[in-house]
Regions:
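Conserved N-terminal beta1-alpha1 strand-loop-helix module at the mouth
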Residues: 1-76, 80, 129, 179
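Hydrophobic faces of well-ordered beta-strands that scaffold small-molecule active sites
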Residues: 4-7, 31-33, 62-66, 86-88, ...
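Generic structural signal for well-ordered alpha-helices
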Residues: 20-21, 48-52, 75, 97-100, ...
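Glycine-enriched alpha-helix->loop->beta-strand junction motifs that scaffold or abut catalytic
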Residues: 27-28, 58-59, 80-86, 104-109, ...
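Alpha-helix-loop-beta-strand connector modules within alpha/beta enzyme cores
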Residues: 48-63, 108, 152-165
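Catalytic cores of alpha/beta
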Residues: 73-77, 118-123, 177-190
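Conserved anion-binding
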Residues: 85-154, 161, 166-168
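Single conserved hydrophobic/aromatic residue that forms the stacking wall/gate
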Residues: 194-202
Length: 202
């Protein structure tokens, strides 16, 4: 079953609490919170205190996507802030297994994200310890980019490997999602899409 997780990158940052409540009311399954530090990616967004402040505005899961250097250092802060899923990049400078285990020990779901140039096989050693894998279909750091359909073989490869092992693994795609690109993502094996929060209350 396909799930939808709106990204905060297209929110009105002056009304984020209202935006979160609206997205839940409109039927969002999760909320995708992009955390950027200006180092791992060139843009800069928000940190754990803002995530904590937003937690009361929605009851659906918060998927916090750490596009930051040294995510291991900041995992405890985001766990305390109310992150239900913590996604960090396999390309970051933190030890992958240690970071996964810290997230698991804190009671949240660990997830790994791959930049477009990173092959699917990079996450295979960790699949048994993950709740999900995020495949970037744009270069991370900015909204409004075009969907990279050539990432779909990567999604399909991860789905095949997860199915071969009998894993109940969520696979998400992030970037350039629209009505035109959903079908390609679903066909490749993605089950969760990160989108811009465009729907409005009826």
């Amino acid at each position: 079953m396909m799930k939808i997780s709106p990204s905060i990158l297209s929110c009105d940052f002056s009304r984020m609490g209202e935006e979160f409540a609206r997205m839940e009311k409109c039927g969002a399954d999760w909320l995708h919170i992009d955390v950027m530090d200006g180092h791992f990616v060139p843009n800069l967004t928000l940190g754990a205190p803002i995530v904590k402040a937003l937690r009361p505005y929605a009851s659906i899961p918060f998927d916090v996507h750490l596009m930051i250097s040294n995510p291991l250092q900041y995992v405890p802060d985001f766990l305390k802030a109310g992150a239900d899923i913590l996604t960090f990049h396999i390309e970051s400078d933190s030890p992958v297994e240690e970071t996964i285990e810290l997230v698991r020990a804190g009671g949240s779901v660990p997830a790994l994200s791959l930049k477009p140039k990173t092959p699917a096989e990079a996450v295979f050693p960790y699949l048994d310890r993950l709740g999900m894998v995020l495949v970037m279909t744009v270069e991370p750091g900015f909204g409004g980019q075009s969907f990279m359909e050539d990432m779909m073989p990567k999604v399909a490869a991860i789905r095949r490997e997860a199915d071969r092992r009998g894993l109940n693994l969520d696979i998400q795609v992030d970037g350039g999602i629209s009505e035109k690109t959903i079908a390609a993502a679903a066909k490749a094996g993605a089950c969760l899409l990160y989108t811009s929060p465009s729907p409005r209350d009826p």
